[in-house]
Amino acid sequence: MILIIYAHPYPHHSHANKRMLEQARTLDGVEIRSLYQLYPDFNIDIAAEQEALSRADLIVWQHPMQWYSIPPLLKLWIDKVLSHGWAYGHGGTAPRGKHLLWAVTTGGGESHFEIGAHPGFDVLSQPLQATAIYCGLNWLPPFAMHCTFICDDETLEGQARHYKQRLLEWQEAHHG
């Protein structure tokens, strides 16, 4: 099962993430947990989230990039749900062996995220990748949709279909 942990503080304003979710929903075996819809008060049901994670084979952290980072509720989710004794540390093996895909949208162009004048995706992904590895997750190459503020509908839809294809290819490779 693919579990998408969706963290968009303003989901009604998102054209890119909305299209990505629409495409993902067309696949069998996909569950979407919209954190800002489930937890507008930031009071995360840790047991429910851990139960959802335990059913998943692929975990996707999908969100818009905000100031070169993740939205605050996703950070809190990571801090609370991936807890000591459950996700890491003595007896913390629950997520071990599962896969993690970082699916992020940006307002900037792809060149904005090349190492040089700006930090590249290899740098920006390091905290998430380190978290994944620490919890025994298999880190997959990230999916990034760039220029989402200026893309036309056709481009956004094409990128959303590419996202769906990534998920489908993972399903086919891991579940025949």
From Swiss-Prot:
Source taxon at top rank: Bacteria
| Enzyme Commission no | 1.6.5.2
Q: What does this protein need as cofactor?
A: FMN
- One short Pfam name that applies is Flavodoxin_2
Task: Name one molecular function that GO assigns to this entry.
Answer: NADPH dehydrogenase (quinone) activity
NCBIfam families from the entry?
PRK00871.1 (NF002044)
HAMAP family per the UniProt record, alphabetical: K_H_efflux_KefF
Q: Please report the name of this protein according to its UniProt entry.
A: Glutathione-regulated potassium-efflux system ancillary protein KefF
Native species: Shigella dysenteriae serotype 1 (strain Sd197)
Gene symbol here is kefF
